[in-house]
Design a protein with these regions (language model features):
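Conserved, function-defining core regions and hallmark residues within catalytic/recognition domains
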Residues: 7
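Structural preference for long, well-ordered alpha-helical segments in enzyme cores
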Residues: 10-11, 24-32, 63-64, 97, ...
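Short helix-loop capping/hinge motifs at secondary-structure junctions, enriched
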Residues: 1-2, 34
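EAL-family c-di-GMP phosphodiesterase catalytic domain
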Residues: 33-35, 50-55, 77-91, 106-198
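Catalytic core of bacterial c-di-GMP phosphodiesterases, primarily the EAL and HD-GYP domains
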Residues: 16-93, 168
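Short acidic-capped amphipathic helix/loop micro-motif used as an active-site/signal-coupling element
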Residues: 1, 25-29, 112, 188
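Catalytic-core regions built around general acid/base machinery
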Residues: 63-70, 96-104, 148, 152
């Protein structure tokens, strides 16, 4: 497997990342469609949205919507992820996309929360359905101060009815703490390393 850091910067420099995204979306929708036809187990797919798409947000929305319709993908199987940094630099376009897909009952996630420059105060206004906590919050092996910060973030997110996802979960200690704090979903090497679609 190639990890994104090994090729995405090159594609972003050459402007090819846009074409790659549409290729990945179509491949993902085809994969879901085939699993549905075979009545195989399906779990929701999270798909990243590159910053470049927010320059032509109407084109992006309609291309992706057409692909969803083409493969007849039920809304509960899709999640679109937008990084916190992308949101900060494209608030109006991101909100336009969120409103469009939320009308179709497709979940939108803020990825890497805590890696950018938004404040906790930002959380009360965002339209996202879920917030994915950046793994750096867990990288210090959950010091007492780190736990307090996470508890406060979780408390605020729960009060604003956001789903909470934590990435970078690697130890049983992390799992126990996050389950105790009612984190909705956990991701990380504790469960699986990246797998091929097959």
């Amino acid at each position: 497997l190639w990890f994104p850091d090994s090729f995405l910067p090159i594609l972003e420099e050459t402007g090819e990342v846009e074409a790659l995204d549409y290729y990945v979306y179509e491949a993902a929708f085809l994969w879901l469609s085939e699993r549905m036809k075979k009545q195989q187990k399906i779990i929701p797919l999270s798909l990243n949205v590159s910053p470049i798409h927010f320059r032509k947000i109407n084109t992006f929305i309609h291309k992706v919507s057409d692909l969803i319709d083409k493969y007849k993908i039920p809304s509960q199987y899709l999640i679109f992820e937008i990084t916190e940094t992308t949101y900060i630099h494209n608030i109006d376009a991101v909100n336009q996309m969120i409103r469009f897909f939320q009308k179709k009952n497709i979940r939108i996630s803020m990825d890497d929360f805590g890696s950018g420059y938004s404040s906790l105060n930002t959380l009360k206004d965002i339209l996202f359905d879920e917030v994915k906590i950046d793994k750096r919050f867990l990288d210090d092996d959950l010091s007492e101060k780190g736990k307090i910060v996470l508890q406060e973030i979780f408390h605020l997110l729960k009060r604003t009815n956001k789903l909470i996802v934590c990435e970078g979960v690697e130890t049983k200690e992390m799992v126990d703490f996050l389950v105790q704090e009612n984190c909705d979903e956990l991701q990380g090497y504790y469960y699986y390393k990246p797998l091929e679609m097959q």
